[in-house]
């Protein structure tokens, strides 16, 4: 805390470039232009991370202070200083944690990157010790069967909206994938593609069977030449454009809480409930680790086990209903509770 307080009081000295050397903004600019890890991110992730980091530049070091985080010396960037930035987003824990995550990545790169004199760009990674804000949010709302039915009733087979729903639900892929899928991906009843997310760092190619329900909707729908889904100008959707359009379709069906990503969650839950294993879920959804798949199989296993065992809670009551209550001191278990 002493280093943070000292940095707040330190006089400002800005070089002609407009960016203080060895300052927080200086390190971020270096990260954007020199980090292979940053360049390997997909365009959308780069954009989001840049926005998160740049949003810290104009944060005052303290309320009412004339100095800002952009000029904060790296040597004085402490855990406390980073947690101040985190806590300013505390009303939205996901945004607060995204700040910490992005700052960690910058310092992680900075401590490894050496300048011409052999010194690292950043003396340490204080963000590593900054904790995340605990949140009980489960993220995007997972669609219920009733919500899927309402969407289908509003958007009949043959519409772009219904085709979008089918592609999302029956492939289990992200919007960044389904906006790029087209007939060129189809062969012998299967669809083959490389997932868009992570394609630069860890490309994942999937081959999925096309279930009959999806094939029927594709055959009955207006499709573009390069992609199944096209916008009103008959061009492939951008990711953001599709997100906005799908939001409109959900609103038209009265589904204010539903989103495209929520269908991916619903698909994983449905598959797990129907008995899909961790490995099977990883194969469908393209997850490289079992973390997400285990989340869904644990939930499905809990429901199945409870279903098979719940009758045991009533075993004594059922027995006494058939033979009469057992006479014992103090009455039956159910009398006591």
What are these regions (language model features)?
Residues 129-131, 135, 141, 145-149, ...:
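Conserved tyrosine-mediated DNA breakage-rejoining catalytic core shared by Y-recombinases
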Residues 9-12, 29-93, 106-109:
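Basic/aromatic-enriched alpha-helical hairpins
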Residues 153-161, 171, 223-227, 234-235, ...:
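Short, basic (Lys/Arg/His-rich) helix/loop patches that form interaction surfaces
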Residues 199, 232-233, 291, 310-337:
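C-terminal secondary-structure termini that scaffold catalytic or DNA-interacting sites
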């Amino acid at each position: 805390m002493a280093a943070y307080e000292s940095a707040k009081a330190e006089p400002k000295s800005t070089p002609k470039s407009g960016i203080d050397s060895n300052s927080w903004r200086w390190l971020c600019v270096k990260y954007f232009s020199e980090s292979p890890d940053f360049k390997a991110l997909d365009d959308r992730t780069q954009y989001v991370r840049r926005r998160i980091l740049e949003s810290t530049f104009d944060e005052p070091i303290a309320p009412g202070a004339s100095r800002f985080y952009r000029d904060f010396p790296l040597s004085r960037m402490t855990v406390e200083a980073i947690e101040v930035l985190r806590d300013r987003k505390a009303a939205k824990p996901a945004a607060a944690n995204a700040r910490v995550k992005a700052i960690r990545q910058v310092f992680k790169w900075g401590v490894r990157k050496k300048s011409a004199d052999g010194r690292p760009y950043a003396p340490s990674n204080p963000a590593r010790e900054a904790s995340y804000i605990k949140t009980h949010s489960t993220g995007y709302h997972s669609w219920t069967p009733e919500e899927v039915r309402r969407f289908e009733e509003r958007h009949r087979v043959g519409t772009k909206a219904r085709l979008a729903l089918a592609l999302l639900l029956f492939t289990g892929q992200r919007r960044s994938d389904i906006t790029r899928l087209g007939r060129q991906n189809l062969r012998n009843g299967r669809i083959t593609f490389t997932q868009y997310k992570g394609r630069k760092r860890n490309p994942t190619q999937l081959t999925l069977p096309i279930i009959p329900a999806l094939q029927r909707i594709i055959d009955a729908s207006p499709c573009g030449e390069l992609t199944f889904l096209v916008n009103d100008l008959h061009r492939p959707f951008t990711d953001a454009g599709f997100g906005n359009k799908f939001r409109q379709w959900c609103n038209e069906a009265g589904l204010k809480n539903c989103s495209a990503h929520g269908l991916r969650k619903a698909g994983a839950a449905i598959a797990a409930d129907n008995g899909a294993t961790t490995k099977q879920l990883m194969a469908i959804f393209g997850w490289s680790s079992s973390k997400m798949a285990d989340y869904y199989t644990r939930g499905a296993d809990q429901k199945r086990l409870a279903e098979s065992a719940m009758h045991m809670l009533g075993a004594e009551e059922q027995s006494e209903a058939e033979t009469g209550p057992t006479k014992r001191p103090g009455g039956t278990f159910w009398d006591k509770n």
